[in-house]
Amino acid sequence: MVSKKNTAEISAKDIWENIWSGVSSLLDFFAVLENLGVVNDKLYVSGLLRKVWLCYSCISVIKCVWKLIKLCKVKFKIDQRLDGEGNGLVKDKLINFKKKYNEHIRHITAALLQDLSYLMVLIYPGTRLFKRLSNIITLCRIIV
């Protein structure tokens, strides 16, 4: 059996990914209820759920940025190998890997955009952080 690292597969799901998706769905559900006005502040138990949501969003943004950094490092190495001399067959494989990594970078940038949008909901408008996040979201939209 070939290991995952050797096959250059980067999107395998594990148990933590499933837990992460479940937490995300639960927080999305509460966000929809809040936006509809169904949930009041008493249910939040002094903003506990809002704090959990804020922590989740921050962790998710950091996770997306970390994945982007790793993918961009690999893409940079592929670009270096393509610039060098080599066999035509190897270059074709590298070009295919580059296309795959470009697609993964687009998907992760879209996920980052969604996570930043969650953060925008939790941060008050007019603050410096809100303005910076707005600029980052605009940049992500341009990339996607």
From Swiss-Prot:
Highest taxon, organism lineage: Eukaryota
Localization terms from the record: Peroxisome membrane
Main location: membrane
Keyword Transmembrane helix belongs to the record: yes
Keywords (A to Z) from UniProt: Membrane, Peroxisome, Peroxisome biogenesis, Transmembrane, Transmembrane helix
GO molecular function term, any single one: peroxisome-mitochondrion membrane tether activity
UniProt KW Membrane keyword: yes
GO cellular component, one term: cytoplasm
Transmembrane segments: 18-30, 52-73, 109-131
GO terms under biological process: peroxisome organization
Membrane disposition: Multi-pass membrane protein
Subunit structure: Homooligomer. Interacts with PEX11, PEX25 and PEX27.
Functional description taken from the UniProt entry: In concert with the three peroxisome divisional factors, PEX11, PEX25 and PEX27, controls peroxisome morphology and abundance under conditions of peroxisome proliferation. Maintains mature peroxisomes in actively dividing cells.
Full protein name: Peroxisomal membrane protein PEX34
Organism the protein comes from: Saccharomyces cerevisiae (strain ATCC 204508 / S288c)
Gene name of this polypeptide: PEX34
